[in-house]
Amino acid sequence: GEGPNGKKQEYDWDAILKTIRRLQPKAVTAIMGDDVRWVGNEGGLGRTTEWSATALMPNSYPGSDEVYKRLGINAMSKDLGSRELVSKASDLFWYPSEVDVSIRPGWFYHAEQDNQVRSLANLVNIYYRSVGCNSVLLLNIPPDKRGLMHENDVKRIKELTEYIKKTFADNKVEKGNRIWTAKVGDTKEYKVRKNTLVNTFLIQEDITKGQRVEGFTVEVFANGAWHHVGEGTTVGYKRLLPFSDSHAEKVRVTITGARGTVNISNIGLYYAEPLVDKTMKVTLSDVPVDGWKTVGMDAAAAIDGKQETVWKTETLTPLVVDMGKEVEIAGFSYAPAQEEDLTGTIYKYNFYVSRDGKDWMKCDATGEFSNIMHNPVPYFVRFGKTYPARYFKLEPVTEINNKAVTAVGEIGVLLK
């Protein structure tokens, strides 16, 4: 490119693309090419609604600037494929999204950044937000002054490769790879292998027949009841939805929106080992705990923003919190005591919300912190929908060793 204050350069894109296709016909041309497009940011984040069938004309096509102006869009627009937008377009393009991000703070090598390589937890999150959101991932790994990839970068890439292979090697859903032809309102149940722990849902469309899903919901059957664990809009080649650990016996998928008949090629459930990003402070609450207060007891240690302080009581006592204002709660976090003695760690629970502190609604959750006895890290429970609430209540049902003790290192609420 021209660089800062550089002279504007003109490129013969037609000749460049023809040369690529002649010499490397299977090469993927990005951004100025018409195979994949830039997602619109360099933070490793795909859109939650991502259409590969889009009204965005490739930049190299004649008249693209006029089309962008007429439709009011560019590569960074949030909406590139809605029905409303497509209805205004004269052409539609199969132009999938490419998420671009660097494994380091910048795109080029700097020795002082050798210890600033993205953590495995961060890269896995990027994978879910890119490949898991119907995009391809371009992960930049800059060569060092030797012309080689630095050892730290190579180590992290190997870790990422092994983590992804291990996570998605074994689909726990029985017959999940059979084609399901469905329309809006259709529901399909799948059996899950017995005695397996899962926390990641996968759904794929047969994109040789196009991209058509506009909305879907996911429920798992566990502990004798169906639980809503997630929902999404577009699917495309692949959509991944993480949810709280569950010993699911069945999974149920419902198509809530579609452009005609949809062709689902794969349904999967997997278990992704939890990762803690040691390079970053784990945020347990999306809502600041300042101004929170517990109701009916002194349990300040559970809401002081410090995992190392613990509220403990010698009974299975519900923890009630007044947040001081109403928010839309999408889930909650529970951190057990960060010490060797795990007595009081909650295993099974109920979670309630209230707008006035009097009338309570039980939230739809699996109701257990699976494997917390052997992996006592913070657990994040997402409901798959939101509840308006000023108050919330965590009710312990059983402790990990069936003792009448409750311990909370920290509790928080999630907004997304």
Label the predicted regions.
Residues 180-184, 207-272, 314-317, 338-416:
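Trp- and acidic/polar-enriched beta-sheet ligand-binding modules for extracellular glycan
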Residues 193-200, 248, 316, 324-333, ...:
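Extended extracellular/luminal ectodomain segments enriched in beta-structured repeat modules
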